[in-house]
């Protein structure tokens, strides 16, 4: 079975969602199904159908999260000792050589990625170009508009 890298923060978010689904959402939908059943004829009961659909979604999401946590390789970026190299979990400050713009990204797992928050997927083109490089190195990234060159200004593990 393959392992999926995930940061400690990402694993905690999954655990929180799983707890909420099991302790709040699941009991609420079970009550909604019971109330809809009490109304009688189920063949034309929209509330019952909606509650059953919601139950299916919740159970599916619970299974999905449990599966991901089972396969997860949880990595705490603050405990990584990569000697200044860019690795999974690292926070990297870059400077676009063409524009001089500075940008900061943290390399995270697939489910954690959110570009607006500066969290990039470990399998994204920019992350793949950065992995293994060090402060002062230049990474070339194939972008839709052509090759972009980024100088690595700083690497942190937090």
Which residues does each predicted region cover?
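Context-gated lysine
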Residues: 13-15, 22, 52, 68, ...
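Helix-rich terminal scaffold detector
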Residues: 1-63, 158
